[in-house]
């Protein structure tokens, strides 16, 4: 994608903006764990538990579940060396791999690590859990963990042209999906139709318009609940 493309986003600049904010707040390494942080900096969707280690300078490194690492690397602008997969077994789990990565960025073993801690009404927000926080704190004894999610929140508030254009195109595609469903349900078409069929009609119409992925907000439950998933 070139700079002249209407959907172009300068992701390396976003990383540098985060690094400039890190420097201003005396943060040596930033550990992103929220879905919004990963999407905003990677240009890839990470449905599995994932993390992004951002050094004070240079490229960040993403860590995701090994079965999805190749796909994330393919979707993201980062090269394969900066998208790694973890396995939930000793020495290869996310705590071990990420701690090793952070230690390499802090040669003297000391520094300030920005983390994302908080609460949300959104289940897969991605804030560090208490277990993760405690494990990172134990694995990095010379490192001070500080809450820093406001860095990304502040920077992401201002939308660039590529982001605005992506929102507009996504909205247009959704309108097509709604129209297809409305037409299918009109004049008694809803009779005998299940919620999953309705969801499929919307997905099919949107895919034909260029959609590459659809994910219902609660993971599928709102189009697969109760008796409506079968013929009524």
Regions found by a protein language model. Give the residues of each.
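Contiguous, non-catalytic segments that form substrate-binding/exosite surfaces or channel walls
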Residues: 186
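A composition/biophysics-driven feature that prefers long, compositionally simple stretches
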Residues: 1-177
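Short catalytic-site patches enriched in acidic/histidine residues
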Residues: 38-50, 149-153, 158, 189-232
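Active-site pocket-lining segments that scaffold enzyme catalytic pockets across diverse folds
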Residues: 171-183, 194-203
